[in-house]
UniProtKB/Swiss-Prot annotation:
It comes from Human papillomavirus 5. SUPFAM superfamilies: Viral DNA-binding domain (SSF54957). One of its GO terms (molecular function) is DNA-binding transcription factor activity. InterPro entries: E2/EBNA1_C_sf, Nucleotide-bd_a/b_plait_sf, Papillomavirus_E2_C. Residues 41-53 have a biased composition (Polar residues). The keyword Repeat does not apply. Keywords: Host nucleus. Residues 1-233 are annotated as: Disordered. It comes from the Viruses. Belongs to the papillomaviridae E8^E2C protein family. This is Protein E8^E2C. GO terms for cellular component: host cell nucleus. The keyword Aminoacyl-tRNA synthetase does not apply.
């Protein structure tokens, strides 16, 4: 309403809507016009900042609040605190591990030193027991277990001597075994080797072989002594067993060829076919013959049980002084 009144009052007197006031003075319309201008300016100025504010809010950047800054700072400080605590815990664990490793190394070093000291004391103890107790009392104080070590050494020597004597008894059968035993005994001890050498030599002399004069000396079967396989073979070699076969020459040759392949290992050797000749001339007497030799009586028995002789062939057992 005030604005309407002001506008009505501000109309010029010559306009059709307004009437001329003769009583009024000309100074009043100027004052009213100035007031209207000032009010309109104030309204326009008040509208302009509002428009700029709305434009800034729509398209401009939001101002950062104090609360958001404080929250981000708190988060950063918390993350820094956590990282510091983690680094501290890691450093502590590393220090603990280094301490444990150093402790284990120190304990291992102490153990190795103790073991080396014990081995040194054990290495020194046999010298003390050899020299005697009166000369070195200090070494006794260092190694209190000298008597036990001496006893153990004596027991070991006794065992070694017994093993050497057993080896000498077991190596009577072959020359190679006796030679190997000699080399070992020389490396072990020269004092204990001499009686063992004598025993092994005496035993090997009996089992070396059979002299020509002794062949066929015993015409009995081999006794069941505990002489071993080699001794039994050597005793049976004194009178080797033989089978003599009589028959036609061709049948004997065929039988020999078959037996060499079929009965391998059940005989020692085959002879060729032969025949007796009369003393007055060169005529053959009787049928041809063939000899089959064996290394033992058991081998001859096994051969005789396994072989099937051809028809028209006769057999007979025998022994020879030598083959």
């Amino acid at each position: 309403m005030k604005l309407k009144m002001l506008l009505l009052s501000s109309t010029p007197p010559g306009s059709p809507g307004g009437q001329a006031d003769t009583n009024t003075t000309p100074a009043t319309p100027t004052t009213s016009t100035t007031a209207v201008d000032s009010t309109s300016r104030q309204l326009t100025t008040s509208k302009q900042p509002q428009q700029t504010e709305t434009r800034g809010r729509r398209y401009g950047r939001r101002p950062s609040s104090k609360s958001r800054r404080s929250q981000t700072q708190q988060r950063r400080s918390r993350s820094r605190h956590r990282s510091r605590s983690r680094s501290r815990s890691r450093s502590k664990s590393q220090t603990h591990t280094t301490r444990s490793t150093t402790r284990s190394r120190s304990t291992s070093l102490t153990k190795t030193r103790a073991l080396t000291s014990r081995s040194r004391s054990r290495g020194r103890s046999p010298t003390t027991c050899r020299r005697g107790g009166g000369r070195s009392p200090r070494r006794r104080s260092r190694s209190p277990s000298t008597s036990s070590s001496c006893t153990t050494q004596r027991s070991q020597r006794a065992r070694a001597e017994s093993s050497t004597t057993r080896g000498a008894r077991g190596s009577r059968g072959s020359r190679g075994g006796s030679r190997g035993g000699r080399g070992r005994r020389r490396g072990r001890s020269s004092s204990s080797s001499s009686p063992a050498h004598k025993r092994s030599r005496g035993g090997s002399a009996k089992l070396r072989g059979v002299s020509p004069g002794e062949v066929g000396g015993s015409l009995r079967s081999v006794s069941s002594k505990h002489t071993g396989r080699l001794g039994r073979l050597l005793e049976e070699a004194r009178d080797p067993p033989v089978i003599i076969v009589k028959g036609a020459a061709n049948t004997l040759k065929c039988f020999r060829n078959r037996a060499k392949i079929k009965y391998m290992g059940l005989f020692r050797s085959f002879s060729t076919t032969w025949s007796w000749v009369a003393g007055d001339g060169t005529e053959r007497l009787g049928r041809p013959r063939m000899l089959i030799s064996f290394s033992s009586y058991t081998q001859r028995r096994d051969f005789d049980e396994a072989v099937r002789y051809p028809k028209g062939v006769d057999k007979a057992y025998g022994n020879l002084d030598s083959l």
